[in-house]
A protein has these predicted regions:
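Short loop/turn segments at connectors of secondary-structure elements within structured domains
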Residues: 15, 60, 74, 513, ...
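Catalytic-core region of carbohydrate-active enzymes that cleave or remodel glycosidic bonds
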Residues: 179, 185, 296, 302-306, ...
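Active-site mouth of glycoside hydrolases
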Residues: 4, 67-69, 85-339, 347-349, ...
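Short capping micro-motif at the N-terminus of alpha-helices
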Residues: 19, 75, 99-101, 108-110, ...
Length: 542
């Protein structure tokens, strides 16, 4: 806060970019051969750095100005040449359901969660090995938390406003992003871990002791922002709602963007992983906080990385409606071992279908597994659910393949990351960002004669006033109705009473033979003259 460093770069096209510098303390890692114990210590004097990713090849000029004690001076100026520009930052594509890079090449995320490492995972060295193994199978995506106390904890050191206190964490993130760039992996950076701002109640089941896993019991009561442990805030709600708390987080954002915004290995900024768990007693707090932080990120991130946020419960996605996010994300966990797993493909498509129908931005499943409490090693040791979920999501119209959880205790120990290879190879051959991709109906056929039975569709939602997502299409296939009938209102509303609920229902079906449609109407309202209109293949039939 006592000095600032600003650099101006002018490119070969005459466009200028002004970037802030950042203060850093160089670090050095020391560990034994297998890095079971990782030590990160300061080395040398603190320095100011500026990081710039040139968007074009050619010659650039630069000038560095330093302001200290109210006086500004030019500390350096010169020029340099860039032989070839990198692929560039990832953004929403020409086809808004998918992603692309600045050079217009398609980017279709195929990867897994890589939330963190820890001492038992060989620290930073172990994380680098995971990135290497992902690259070996052709994956291009990972998801990293930078707000956990046992690995990269940018919000977990004291004093909470001290840059010096987070320099070991910053070294880890430097190293990880540089390694990710080497291997062609783009990382979604989770900036706020919800559990650090809520009360952790433990697991409802007993997790196995083998394989080893980090202790993730940290929560608000151990958060360094909590006044009970020396922080400045009485509650998590105060941090997210007060000007002091918001200014503190903006300062962290400013440092994050200045130090790591240059990297093409940053896929996106995820502000909060589960926004509905932050100050749930007053949802307007987190919605207002997200609106303010999204606007601030767009202001300071000149590379325009995509911005998103998530919720735990997909039914609470409306919490994010007022926030202008670049893409949507949802979690998908079944409840193994408490309940047996259901149809994984059908559940995946039912979750994604209503979100994809809007078509206004990409949708990703950012976490999935058979259970949210520990890895499904006993229930699915071969990882069959990984294949079905990733392929179902990739071919559903989502912006990328679903990303599994349990990287450290399931995917890598059992070498299940091999399943990413065929999907990654397939995805590389598809121009996702530019093609006009449309869903199609497919079916298996046989040589023998077939007999057909009537298909009865029932189980509609009988809640009065229930409104489905707008412009939803229902696809009737041999396997299922997508989205399910429970999302179809049982009532059809007219234009006189309850007109706000009036919406046409559209069903898409490809019958295998001549078919008769029968619609049963149990009763009509006696308060207004009702008339049902049925259109088949654009032709009125009733």
């Amino acid at each position: 806060n006592q000095a600032s460093v600003i650099a101006e770069f002018v490119g070969p096209d005459g466009a200028s970019v002004t970037l802030p510098g950042f203060w850093m303390q160089p670090q050095r890692q020391t560990c034994n051969q297998d890095c079971a114990v990782e030590l990160i210590d300061p080395v040398g004097d603190p320095v100011w750095r500026i990081r710039f990713s040139p968007p074009l090849p050619g010659r650039y000029t630069y000038r560095v100005d330093v302001t200290d004690g109210g006086e500004t001076r030019t500390a350096a100026q010169g020029s340099f040449a860039v032989q070839a520009a990198a692929g560039g930052t990832i953004r929403v594509g020409e086809n808004p359901r998918y992603f692309e890079r600045d050079d217009d090449s398609s980017f279709f995320p195929v990867g897994i969660n890589l939330g963190w490492s820890w001492t038992g995972g060989r620290g930073t060295r172990g994380y680098q090995d995971w990135l290497r193994r992902l690259a070996e199978v052709g994956a291009n995506y990972g998801r990293l938390y930078v707000d956990v106390p046992w690995f990269v904890g940018l919000g977990w050191r004291q004093p909470v406003d001290s840059l010096a206190a987070i320099q070991a964490d910053a070294w880890r993130l430097d190293t990880i992003l540089q390694t990710a760039e080497q291997y062609g992996i783009a990382l979604q950076i989770v900036l706020v871990w919800h559990q650090g701002w809520s009360a952790y109640g433990g697991l409802p089941v007993i997790a196995p002791t083998d394989p080893a896993r980090p202790n993730i019991a940290a929560d608000w009561f151990s958060n360094p922002h909590n006044i009970q442990v020396g922080g400045p805030f009485q509650s998590a709600a105060q941090y997210f709602s007060s000007p002091e708390g918001r200014d503190l987080f903006k300062a962290r954002l400013q440092y994050i963007v200045a130090r790591w915004g240059y990297s093409n290995s940053v896929f996106a900024w995820e502000l909060v992983d589960q926004a509905d768990r932050i100050a749930p007693e007053d949802p307007t707090i987190i919605t207002g906080w997200l609106q303010e932080m999204v606007a601030y990120l767009r202001q300071i991130d000149l590379y325009h990385h995509p911005i998103t946020s998530g919720v735990r419960d997909a039914a609470r996605l409306s919490l994010l409606d007022a926030v202008v996010l670049d893409f949507r994300e949802v979690r998908f966990y079944q409840t193994v071992p408490i309940e047996p797993a259901g149809d994984q493909v059908l559940a995946t498509l039912n979750l994604l279908g209503p979100l994809i129908q809007t078509g206004d931005r990409p949708v990703l499943i950012n976490e999935f597994s058979l259970g949210p409490w520990f890895e499904p090693a006993q229930e699915d040791g071969l990882g069959t659910h990984l294949i079905t979920t990733m392929w179902a999501s990739a071919l559903s119209g989502a912006g990328g393949a679903a990303a599994s959880w349990w990287w450290d205790t399931y995917l890598f120990p059992r070498n299940l990351v091999e399943y990413l290879g065929p999907l990654a190879a397939f995805a590389r051959g598809v121009p996702w960002n530019s093609a006009e991709l449309q869903p199609v109906s497919v079916a298996l056929t046989g040589d023998g004669s077939l007999s057909y039975q009537p298909l009865r569709i029932a189980g509609f939602n009988e809640a009065f006033g229930y409104m489905r997502p707008p412009d939803t299409l229902y696809r009737i296939t041999a396997d299922a109705i997508i989205p399910p009938p429970s999302s179809v209102p049982a009532y059809l509303y007219g234009t006189v009473y309850s007109a706000q609920f009036s919406e046409p229902q559209t069903f898409i079906i490809t019958p295998p033979t001549d078919t008769r449609l029968i619609i049963n109407v149990s009763r009509t309202s006696d308060r207004a003259e009702a008339r049902l209109i049925v259109i088949v293949n654009d032709q009125p039939v009733a």
